[in-house]
Amino acid sequence: MQINKFLLFFLSILILTSCSKNVVEDSVLKEKSLDLQVLEAYQEGKEYLENGDPLFAAKKFNEAEILFPQSEWAPKSALMAAYSYYSYDYLKDAIAELDRFLKIYPKYKNLDYVYYLLGISFYEQIVDEKKDLQSIIKAKQYFEKV
């Protein structure tokens, strides 16, 4: 009797598992490669910047940097994000992005451009040279590094 119950249990499990499908569906559309995603995000950022939307441009450039942080596109994307902010007078955002850039990529080959952009961002923040010297001093420091 014990053997019959075991056999009945085993057969029922066997029948139930044989009825289930384990089909892997192949999609016609494959996932995009990471390189392609980085390039697309970078291109979208350029398009947003050309169309006058610096915030979405910076967001796309940052997305490109995040997707592939060890690629050659990462520092370019971070720099373009900072330029996006600068080009539409979001100077504090540009400065923050450039400071972050200097911390992450201290040996980047075009650091002179980063220092120039930092200097010009501080220079353009000068409202009254008699009241606030902080922007003048910072601009001078960064221009001296160029």
Each language-model region and where it sits:
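Acidic, polar-rich low-complexity tracts and alpha-helical solenoid repeat scaffolds
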Residues: 18-146
